[in-house]
Amino acid sequence: MVAKLRAEHALIFVPFVLALWSISRVWTVLPSIMQDEYIYTSQAKNLPFAEQFYSNYLFSLIMGITNSCGDEFYACTKTINSFFFISTVLLTFLIAIRFLTFRWSVFVASVTALSPIAIPVSYFMPETMYFSMMTLTIWLTLVVSKRDTWLLWVVSGLSLGATALVKPHAVFMLPAFVIFAFIYAYKKSASNWLKAIAAGVAVTVGFLVTKFGLGFAFAGTEGLKLFGGYGTPVGALTGAAAAEDVVVGTDSVARSGLEVLITVASTHFLAHASAMLLLAGIPLFLALRVSYSVVKTKQPIGEVSALFVLVALITVSMVGVVALFEAYVTASGDDHSDRLILRYYEFLIPQFVVMGLLLPRFTDSKRLFRIIQGSIIVAASMFFTIYYPPTFDKQYADASTLPGIGDSQGFFIFVGIFVSCAVIFWIVNPERGNLVIGRFIMPAVLILALVMSQNKLIEINGTPAYFDQAGWGTREFLEDVPGDRIMVVGQTRTEVFTVKFWIDEANIKDLLVVEGSVIAADNVSESDYVVTLGNIGVDFAHEVVTEGEGYKLVKVLR
């Protein structure tokens, strides 16, 4: 018996071995989200906290370690990200083991290791750390909810506040955690309003202590801004709505900021909601049903129900907020109408897997309600798989789940049909349908999404391009040159930002031109060194410092 238990416990190593495999697949991938990766590396490695536009000071503090790695800083980045990804796998196991058997918890952790959230390990971005911190916050929230003292809710807020110093977008989830604490405490205390309010206040206070207390410790008064350089949400939205002549899409038709805000927000909300229903429609509908039941009943919230209510609150809040954020950015002049950003809440994917396996724990809806729910999920799945590929740009900057699986419309529609068939089977036979969806359909879609996203990413950035060589070849000559005295001239943002990333200095200027352009002296009046990419000439006194295939570094002579 003891030997059997030891053999079973050895299974705990399986998800971590799978995580290492996922990491190895993207280990050699080169920078892929160029503008963001350049901004984050510049902040973390080269700028004081008070001068950073994004208030992700904990991320910058930890990633600043890569300064000690020299030219190998990108490998160090992936090592740090790997630690946080493996932490996410472990934390997911700890969440699952609260509700499931040991073997099924190992299964959940294994699916997490093989899910699309492994992709950001390759990036110099906060995503992997953010996913880990949000998973930690969910786990801590579930743990403290079982305790008898309202004061422990502070722990949930402290963790969420720390997460906001990794990625400020965590602040969008504060209402979800406050509402959850309020409802949970209210039900647990037999409708005691004071204890419910105290729990919600405790979460808020904990958040404010870490978000602004540590923020001030890092960056002084600059650390007291809620969203860093973005300002206040109300001010940002008001300014965007008041904008005039905003051009969206390829039709070149100018519209008012308010019209763009409403149009993009509504269409993107529908797209985000449809994407979530494709990935986890049955568990999410159950989560909404459980949440409604919790509000109606006077009974304390059960442990399993707590997970569903918390995930429902986070999902609903993030779908709405991210759609509004995309609309705000578009109305402000940076067209995001063709971008669907799921990466702000892809950390929920492991929780969807746990919820899928918990479906059999709940009483099935009556057939009429199953037909209604199933019809909505099927319609949303087919709508999204048809609408997404031709409408949205498949950027890794926006999501890890969709770029691979959504690259081919025909294949994506097949995925929609695959999910829809499972939902129809669930309508007819809910007992077996729950098992099929939780144990097979959802994990299969996630693993498929990972492999296809990895394959596409490796195809795009798995081999060094000439502009990678340009960054490597010029870096050593520019080590002691301030970034604002360097200019990179190229034909695409990808080329230019890749070179800036590898040079690894803050505030490097850039200029986009067409093939065969000649750069005049006026363009480089505030630069001492210029990197040119491709067939680009210069018309000013200069000295060639170094050159290679497709690039040249020149010193401006005055």
Segments (PLM) and residue ranges:
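Membrane-lumen/periplasm interface segments of specific transmembrane helices
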Residues: 21-23, 193-295, 311-327, 380-392
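Transmembrane-helix signature of polytopic, membrane-embedded enzymes
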Residues: 92-114, 132, 147-151, 155, ...
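Transmembrane-helix motifs of polytopic, lipid-linked glycan transferases
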Residues: 79-99, 132, 136-140
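Extracytoplasmic catalytic/substrate-binding loops of multi-pass membrane glycan-assembly enzymes
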Residues: 27-41, 50-65, 69-75, 466
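Membrane-interface transmembrane helices that cradle and orient dolichyl/undecaprenyl
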Residues: 137-152, 187
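Loop-to-helix entry region of an early transmembrane alpha helix in multi-pass inner-membrane enzymes
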Residues: 57, 61, 70-90, 120, ...
